A protein has these predicted regions:
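Helix-to-loop junctions at the C-terminal end of transmembrane segments
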Residues: 67-79, 164, 317-330, 414-415
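Structural signature of the two symmetry-related core transmembrane helices
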Residues: 82-97, 332-347, 424-427
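Helix-loop boundary and gating motifs at the non-cytosolic
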Residues: 3-63, 266-308
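C-terminal membrane-cytosol helix-exit motif in multi-pass small-molecule transporters
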Residues: 168, 202-225, 436-441
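Juxtamembrane intracellular "pre-TM" segments in multi-pass secondary transporters
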Residues: 1-15, 217-272, 451
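Conserved MFS/SLC helix-loop-helix module at the cytosolic interface between two early adjacent transmembrane helices
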Residues: 66-102
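Central cavity-lining transmembrane alpha-helices of secondary-active solute carriers
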Residues: 55-73, 308-320
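Hydrophobic core of transmembrane alpha-helices in multi-pass small-molecule transporters
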Residues: 26, 94, 105-121, 275, ...
């Protein structure tokens, strides 16, 4: 209780832009929670299969990947406020297209545009919070931001699971409508219930624009930062030239020995870890709502509750992860929960029994994700300080790129072979990710110097 009161007091001390940002995120992530539960189910109700869902996910990620660098340039040029406003507008229009359009090409175009908008939000998030806070405020600000995102998502997932039931119970919009309105809504009752629920989610997101317009202009802050980072850009240019020289030297005679040495470097092992994790996660995680509702027979409301419980348990286990680091060490904290989660995942995917899957799903997610923050710290500490920016970019590209590929492949495999194959494949990929991590850092994770 004392910690809660301290965070509430700290919120009042945050800068104006930071407080308004948190309010906007709270409203936005309720909508995110609703969409997380319902959008794939909406596509299934329209008659699409999981292979098309995989294509939608891939196209959205492709749009984001192509926009990451231009988004960073726009943030530096126009500031966080304008980027937040216009990217939210773009996501709003794309989201409306994803809900109202029902043919494949407009849905894919809408997903691509939504990915572009999402890239801007992703790029502006951390720098905006950092620029609009002091060094003392940042730990509290980033923690509160994560908690708000989690709580709002859980609320959205719970609410989103109930909305289709409410509309299907006899709402006026489910009956005969004027021709102009009838054409905008899906003909099938189940698809229309999902569609109306998603439209409700967009209405909930609309007030999130108000705090953005109330923010103070922050372009001057970004210009000062841009001036301050000139030296960093010069260093990056030098690092790039050095890297090119090293690559040329690498393929000189005797490169087999250098190859073995390069594969054993912490950066290589950790990048491979993120790549295998991303590929494995992409195979099945985007389809869990379809798996529970379509394959196991759960209602959307039940899945929303299950996923909400998983997020809550994940948050609680994340809070105690540092305690495990002190007791059993950082490498054991990273590996043991994740390895324990693998058999639980196999039971969920290979034993089609709803009560069992509903009970194991939150535990699996909590074990798999509880040390995610610890992994981020570990991944940074294992490389030299001057290379951490490049390392973080490598990790993100590896994870997000392989996740997109996994999501596309997962949809095809589920459609043509079934669910057990994707769960088994994900288990193999997770083992390929974790075993090299243990092999590389098993001897001494404390005294080993960064490379």
């Amino acid at each position: 209780m004392q910690y809660l009161l301290e965070y509430i007091r700290q919120y009042g001390r945050f800068q104006r832009n930071a407080r308004l940002y948190l309010i906007s995120m709270a409203l936005s992530y309720v909508t995110v929670g609703i969409i997380t539960v319902l959008y794939n189910l909406y596509l299934i109700a329209l008659g699409y299969n999981t292979d098309f869902i995989g294509l939608i996910l891939f196209i959205g990620t492709l749009g984001a990947a192509l926009t990451i660098i231009p988004a960073g340039v726009c943030v530096d040029r126009f500031g966080g406020k304008l980027v937040l406003i216009w990217s939210s507008v773009l996501i709003g229009f794309a989201g409306a297209g994803q809900i109202l359009f029902r043919t494949s090409v407009p849905l894919l175009v809408s997903a691509f545009i939504a990915g572009i908008g999402g890239a801007f939000i992703l790029v502006v998030n951390a720098p905006f919070l950092a620029l609009n806070s002091s060094e003392e405020e940042r730990p509290h600000l980033f923690s509160i931001n994560l908690v708000i995102m989690l709580v709002a998502t859980v609320v959205g997932e719970t609410f989103g699971g109930l909305l289709p039931l409410w509309f299907a119970a006899g709402h006026t919009l489910m009956g005969p409508l004027p021709a102009w309105l009838n054409g905008a809504l899906a003909a099938k009752n189940q698809a229309r219930a999902y569609q109306l629920s998603l439209l409700t989610a967009s209405v909930i997101a609309a007030p999130s624009f108000i705090p953005l317009f109330m923010m103070e202009d922050d372009r001057l802050l970004y210009r000062r930062q841009q001036t301050a980072t000139t030296e960093e850009r010069r260093h990056f240019s030098e690092l790039w030239n050095t890297s090119v020289t090293r690559i040329r030297a690498f393929f000189a005679p005797g490169y087999h020995t250098r190859l073995r040495s390069a594969l054993a470097r912490p950066l290589t092992v950790l990048t491979a870890l993120y790549a295998f994790q991303g590929l494995g996660a992409g195979l099945f995680i985007p389809y869990m709502n379809v798996y529970f509702v379509q394959h196991l027979g759960a209602s959307p409301a039940l899945f929303g509750s299950i996923d909400g419980a998983a997020n809550i348990l994940n948050a609680l286990l994340t809070l105690i992860a540092p305690w495990f680091v002190v007791r059993i060490g950082i490498l054991a904290t990273l590996l043991i929960p994740r390895l324990l989660a693998i058999p639980l995942m196999l039971v969920i995917g290979c034993v089609p029994y709803l009560p069992l899957a509903a009970g194991l799903y939150p535990v699996r997610q909590g074990l798999a994700d509880m040390s995610q923050g610890i992994l981020q710290v570990f991944s940074m500490e294992r490389v030299a300080r001057k290379h951490r920016g490049v390392a973080n970019s490598s990790y993100q590209v590896a994870y997000q790129g392989m996740w997109a590929i996994g999501a596309s492949l997962g949809g095809l495999v589920i459609q043509n072979v079934g669910y057990p194959v994707v769960f088994i494949s994900a288990a193999v990929l997770y083992c390929l990710a974790y075993l090299p991590l243990w092999w590389r850092f098993r001897l001494d994770t404390k005294s080993e110097r960064p490379s």
